[in-house]
Amino acid sequence: MAIHLYKTSTPSTRNGTVDSQVKSNPRNNLIYGQRRCGKGRNARGIITARHRGGGHKRLYRKIDFRRNEKDIYGRIVTIEYDPNRNAYICLIHYGDGEKRYILHPRGAIIGDTIVSGTEVPIKMGNALPLTDMPLGTAIHNIEITLGKGGQLARAAGAVAKLIAKEGKSATLKLPSGEVRLISKNCSATVGQVGNVGVNQKSLGRAGSKRWLGKRPVVRGVVMNPVDHPHGGGEGRAPIGRKKPTTPWGYPALGRRSRKRNKYSDNLILRRRSK
């Protein structure tokens, strides 16, 4: 990712950074509109997800997470910006005339060829079942359920590692540090998701954050007691509790938020690291 810096006299453009190489010009048959409803509110209009609202209108890009164009070579034609995710996307032209978007693998450039199927080369951007990959392979866009499409390691810079294969299962180390079992027949894409420097990008001003649909975050300690357990006091006062809490009074640090008795509990060999 090429970061462009502006030399100007205003703080917003002086501190902001822009990616100068990736543009957005999507194909009409691979996009569709989405109804923006709720903005963090439920059917009653009550806020259930804070800090959401506003933002620029978006067109959703149809991403091929299944990679079911088997044994047909495709060529990367464009690398585009996608407003719906922090990773870039690639437009692929397949040999049979099919055109699809996929997640941009790190290091892939325009003109590279990719293919999906069984016993395809272990090459960046190729998709194949885990049973055909050697141990230690870096992968992304990993299926959890066979044929459903990739669901794991899809964010910018995400990469998982195949560390073991035994019986009908493969053992993966995910970007969060979690180690879990997945069926060896599930597919994944070789390589790492591109745009690894997304966390180094500076928005420069608050308005850029609002364009993304994110509203301001206010600290509980500056609120009134009626609004937050940390609120109240004279001047700059501490939170008045032994441990920080959420706005609803639950412990804010260290509390496990994963739902109990999930089917996948037996598949997780090691919890994700904090």
Curated annotation (Swiss-Prot):
GO molecular function: RNA binding; rRNA binding; structural constituent of ribosome; transferase activity
UniProt cross-references to PROSITE patterns, sorted A to Z: RIBOSOMAL_L2
Gene Ontology cellular component annotations, sorted alphabetically: chloroplast; mitochondrial large ribosomal subunit
Subcellular location: Plastid, Chloroplast
Keyword Ribonucleoprotein (UniProt): yes
Biological process per Gene Ontology, one example term: mitochondrial translation
Main location, first listed in the record: plastid
Compositional bias (Polar residues): 7-25
Descriptive protein name: Large ribosomal subunit protein uL2cz/uL2cy
Species of provenance: Solanum lycopersicum
